[in-house]
Amino acid sequence: MEKKNIDWSSIGFGYIPTDKRFVANYKNGAWDEGVLTSDPMVTISECAGVLQYAQTCFEGMKAYTTEDGHIVTFRPDLNAERMESSCKRLEMPVFPKERFVDAVVQTVAANEAYVPPYGSGATLYIRPYMFGSDAVIGVKPANEYQFRIFTTPVGPYFKGGAKPITIRVCDYDRAAPHGTGHIKAGLNYAMSLYAIMDAHRQGYDENMYLDAATRTKVEETGGANFLFVTKDNKVVTPKSNSILPSITRRSLLVVAKDYLGLEVEEREVYFDEVKDFAECGLCGTAAVISPVGKIVDHGKEICFPSGMTEMGPITKKLYETLTGIQMGRIQAPEGWIKVIK
């Protein structure tokens, strides 16, 4: 199929409508078959559960054109499983895993012309989401729901190379103990908006959230997990019940251990030990890894030996290996790549 006439090198990380999106409705205790539609508009009750009580969750993933010309997605089964966890915590009906993956395949295939070519640095971003759609005036779960998937082409997250960012230790809390920090709920991101805009106004790129209970342990940022590298090249990621289980982070730990032969640790990371790490990065779907060069704790600077000019050597190897797997340049572990075409 001929690609759309898009300057792939100039598009940013924003919304560009594509031709088709998937829609399924839940009513009377069951999901319908779902359809692909050209209509990008959502029509719901003014009293819909999503509008009144934020009953919504979502996922984020990408489709790629590989080196040999295939269109693929990366570990969509894990997105389905994570969305299942989100739905259960928010008292929403689960959209079955097999149907989730099939709907992703249908949607990407229907928008094949928008999948950027190999080597462009761009990808097709995929956004599955679900929300309570019928009227709810009392505080309770909705009775009807809609599951949708739209896609949009996005440019390379880093134009001109990945430059290390500066983040601050945030005075606000992202998630409460035993709360919803471990799921991908819209309400978590709404709560982070003031904090991230405040960080930007103060000249910082991102926030480092500490645990709400003791404010001594590293959790995550508003939209990415932390990854640290020790001075003896051990890869360490924070572990907490309040952290979203990043699929990128899980994959990077496998890459570190099985592809690079590095020791890995998932454990509680105390803020006091951050100054002793050699490298720091933020990992997620959008950028894979964003290198962190400096953390500012109320005026006190922690500068990583990797510096402010480029990724640290281990972070760079992790990034290059995982993106190589996603783009088909490196053999993937079994089950990681879902071929669409």
Short names for language-model regions:
Residues 97-99, 107-121:
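Charged, gly/pro-rich active-site loop segments
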